[in-house]
Amino acid sequence: VQANTVVLPGGADAAVVRLRPQQGAGAMAKATRAVAAVVDCPNRWVALDPERGGMAAVAEAARNLSCVGAEPLAITDNLNFPSPETPTGYWQLAMACRGLATACKGLDTPVTGGNVSLYNETRLPDGRMQPIHPTPVVGMVGLVHDLAHVTGLAWQEAGDAIWLLGAPLAAGADERVTLAGTSYLECIHGQLTGRPPVIDLALERSVQAFLRQAISQGLVASAHDLSDGGLAVAAAECCMASGLGAHLELPAGDGRLDHLLFAEGGARILVSVPPAQTVAWQQALDQASSAGHDVPAQCLGVVAAGADLSMSQAGIPLVELPIDQLRTTFEQAIPRRMGADLPPTA
């Protein structure tokens, strides 16, 4: 309330709140800086591998802050776990904390506080009690140094190039990007299985630092991380947020299409770059490479003036979905679960 909100939750990967001008010695003459905040927990990953899941929670929170141009500073954790008096519960808590600690050290985001809730159970439909999945929720704050450079997730202009930062789309095996523990497996196949992706903290650091620098230089029009649902869902969210369409050309190969579309992990971020910034963008990538920083980047497509999300591979159409259909499906998700229907959004 009265906190000078710059970006509301949902408009970007993190909420942004302006820091008001202060009085006295050393005070800011005007509001030029802001605090960004985000909360994350890849609950499926934690259930399958608490250590990797704990690392992923911190990495995703930092990535979300970087997507708005904020420098990650610190976290607070909210640890919700079953009984630690059982071998499984004790192991889950210990390994999740180890993962949180490893990622916090690797990304320079200290833990400033938190809380713990143990002995949590849920009642099944048949009346039996079952331990909850381990749920280490990470809240992270970051600093926006210049309010003139805050980036949302929505495409901005037709003709902007769409780039993927982070582990590239490829048919080959990459432990950093997998289908294990994904939304796709759970929603489409009803499976919660596999070992989640390896968390590459060095890649996270380099990609996030590069993105923040590019945003500060005005090279990036939008940025959105690939998390739940992978590439296909991230692209759909950017389309729904903007009303602009997009065309993506997936790399050819013998790999599984569902892996290309829905795999998760890999410190990946989808960004759009205006044509006027193409040369400067490529120079920034070249400079990062020359400096020894690992910042993989692929140009996947272009923002379109039409109201459709399309994807193809080797010129063969794979996906062609109207944005209105995507938005209706998204907005009807809760009513569908509740057995009710809402009128379509105007």
Where are these regions (language model features)?
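Glycine-rich phosphate/pyrophosphate-binding loop regions near the starts of catalytic domains
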Residues: 1-170, 182-188, 193, 261
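Glycine-/charge-enriched secondary-structure boundary and capping motifs
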Residues: 96-103, 107-112, 116-136, 193, ...
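Long hydrophobic segments that form regular secondary structure
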Residues: 1-15, 20-33, 54, 154-242, ...
